[in-house]
Swiss-Prot record:
Domain of life: Bacteria
Single GO cellular component term: extracellular region
Family assignment from sequence similarity: Belongs to the glycosyl hydrolase 18 family.
Cell compartments where the protein resides: Secreted
Species this protein is from: Yersinia entomophaga
Pfam families reported for this sequence: Glyco_hydro_18 (PF00704)
Protein name (Swiss-Prot/TrEMBL): Chitinase 2
């Protein structure tokens, strides 16, 4: 039995219940996730989300956070008061000093906050980058009863997430401060996800900002190959970007220290580039999959090629028949080396342009993409057959204009299995003209002619399914384990300071979820709410959440447990293939739990770390005007 973080309530909002709503009653400290209708002081109230026994109708909080779930409906009639009652006073208090098992003190993070070159304050009043490590949150992963009929939960896992030199006495330099995510936290519940996607492999020929690293590994491969009886490789071949982190280390990858091999680097890695000899993140994923299978859970593994920083050569590769053959053969080779993988994920950002600066692009990218997928499908089927079939997935933009250049309907017709819709980064500081939601499911009610400023996941899904005819079960809806922030935000005009110091964890404008939970959003005291001067708010125009602090106009668009659960419910209702996150190493389990519950999975009461029910509340309601509405004035 897990020591469960128990709230003051006794029934989870997510629990299955036959009771949809209660008949009108006198207020009497009702508690739970059901819909209650009560009379208090001559008025009728209903709860809009989880309600605690100590929340008194009509009494709000002083800081603007929605601590009180009761919403005024109407005046009670004299007949109702006579028959039901009319309490007018209350003498209840919240449980005080609730234990705080989500947050954990991490001395390295605290020391970093106080460094003169960092000078971070949790209210956003000083330095904007926190360099918060994942260690500030305890693992909060619940166990859920398996159900093969429900949509799947996936997550990308990055091969740089494990690093944090502060664990070894470093941290004086910015590049030494890392996330320090430990894969061992998932070892405690290997059934958290249905698929994990190892990210990223690079492509020989890369010309982007990672080109030197790609070239180093490429040269190292070719230097080792002759002595191992292997052919040398050329442009188009996929390579690991971090041989030591992928194959050699035991730190933060769920492996015992003795399994590490510090000699592994670009010039020595090739003998270890296989499933049975790998340590590093690849070895950790191997062991995680074994643990999942041992407990009866099928954990699929995929490997992703490209991503934002490694997509520079896709266009040239896809256009060249010889390099396509090299690429396809190298993907087959990776599957042979690592048979634990069942899927290859192509993350080309983006066909037709719009990716990182310096990326090659062409008007023919869409048609060449089809050739690449077609040839890859043919080679995989020829080598592995049906019984050991390997899937092909892509990560694609959530922006309709970019989707149109990817020829996705033809990709599906030529063998594409899954589409991971990157329904995040709709907003971001510097590139966005206005503050907005970065990972919202729904568009504003009337986006009008300015819809490019108010994007949404649903609009992208509508294009894929209704315009291109993509089957819903091939689409996986993305949620973000990080926020997008701005400073100097004005909620009326949606203006912000474009080049200002926006709050972030490791980079400007990108606070990660564990950092958000530590510094800006309270998830520990019965409800999701803001803290340290931040207010959790819900835009009723798009049904999306954000955090806002008036002190400096700090704005953080984010997915909360409520919005992630909402995405899971949408996926289940519309029979999508599932939901996924970028990235699993930015979450402590709260958002993964919310996704599971939204998809319809039921928590195992004997292995439930946290009751998620109270965390599904909306924030303080506000109506953010669409850009069309603002411009029409």
């Amino acid at each position: 039995m897990v020591n469960k973080y128990t709230y003051t309530s006794s029934k989870a909002m997510s629990d299955i219940s036959d009771v949809i709503g209660e008949p009108l009653a006198a207020w009497d400290s009702q508690v739970g996730g059901r819909v209650f209708n009560v009379i208090f002081d001559g008025k009728v109230y209903t709860n809009t989300y989880w309600v605690e026994r100590w929340q008194v109708p009509g009494i709000g909080s002083s800081d603007g956070n929605p601590h009180n779930a009761w919403k005024f409906v109407r005046a009670a009639t004299a007949d109702e008061i006579n028959k039901i009652g009319n309490p007018t006073t209350a003498d209840v208090k919240p449980t005080e000093n609730i234990p705080s098992p989500i947050l954990v003190e991490d001395k390295y993070t605290e020391e970093t906050y106080s460094r003169p070159d960092v000078n971070f304050k949790e209210d956003g009043s000083q330095g904007n980058l926190s360099y918060t490590a994942t260690r500030v949150c305890a693992p909060m992963y619940n166990h859920y009863v398996g159900d093969k009929t429900k949509p799947k939960l996936s997550a990308y896992i990055t091969d740089w997430c494990q690093y944090d030199a502060r664990l070894d006495g470093g941290g004086s330099k910015e590049e030494e401060r890392g996330r320090g995510f430990d894969l061992a936290t998932l070892m405690q519940n290997p059934a958290t996800y249905d698929r994990l996607i190892f990210s990223f492999l690079g492509i020989c020929g890369d010309i982007g900002n990672k080109s030197k690293k790609v070239q180093e590994v490429w040269d190292g491969w070719n230097a080792q190959a002759p002595s191992l009886g292997l052919p040398q490789i050329g442009k188009g071949h996929i390579v690991p970007l971090d041989p030591y982190g992928d194959l050699g280390t035991a730190r933060n990858v769920g492996l015992p220290p003795e399994s590490a091999d510090t000699s592994i680097e670009s010039g020595t890695f090739l003998p270890y580039y296989q499933q049975n000899r790998a340590a590093g993140l690849l070895g950790g994923l191997r062991e995680l999959q074994k643990k999942a299978h041992a407990m009866g859970h099928k954990l699929d593994l995929a490997f992703s090629i490209g991503g934002w920083s490694l997509s520079s050569y896709f266009s040239a590769l896809a256009e060249n028949p010889d390099e396509r053959r090299v690429f396809v053969a190298s993907v087959v080779d990776f599957f042979v080396r690592f048979p634990m993988f069942s899927c290859v994920d192509i993350d080309w950002e983006y066909p037709g342009g719009g990716g990182d600066e310096g990326n090659i692009s062409s008007d023919k990218d869409g048609e060449n993409y089809v050739l690449l997928i077609k040839e890859l499908r043919s080679a995989l089927d020829s080598r592995f057959g049906y019984s050991n079939r390997k899937e092909i997935s892509i990560a694609c933009s959530g922006v309709k204009a970019k989707l149109k250049k990817s020829n996705i309907d033809q990709l599906v017709a030529n063998g594409l299995d899954n589409i991971y819709l990157m329904s995040y980064d709709f907003f971001g500081t510097i590139w966005a003209d206005y503050i907005g939601h970065h990972t919202n499911l729904y568009s504003p009610k009337d986006p009008g002619e300015q819809e490019l400023f108010d994007l949404s996941a649903e609009a992208a899904i509508d294009y894929l399914h209704n315009e291109l005819g993509i089957p819903m079960e091939k689409i996986h809806l993305g949620y973000a384990n990080y926020g997008r922030s701005a400073v100097g935000g004005d909620l009326t005009t949606r203006q912000y300071t474009k080049n200002g110091p926006a709050l972030g964890t490791m980079e400007n404008g990108a606070p990660e979820f564990f950092d958000i939970v530590k510094n800006y959003m309270d998830a520990e005291h019965s409800l999701s709410m803001g803290k340290n001067g931040f207010v959790l708010m819900t835009d009723t125009n798009a049904d999306a959440d954000f955090l806002f602090s008036e002190a400096k106009g700090h704005f953080i668009s984010l997915d909360t447990p409520r919005t992630v659960k909402q995405k899971g419910e949408y996926a289940a209702k519309n029979k999508l293939g599932g939901v996924f996150s970028w990235s699993g190493d930015q979450d402590c389990g709260l958002l993964a739990n919310a996704a599971r519950e939204g998809l319809g999975y039921v928590a195992d009461s004997n292995q439930e770390t946290i009751d998620m029910g109270p965390l599904y509340n909306p924030g303080k309601e506000i109506y953010l005007k669409s850009i069309s509405e603002i411009k029409s004035k």
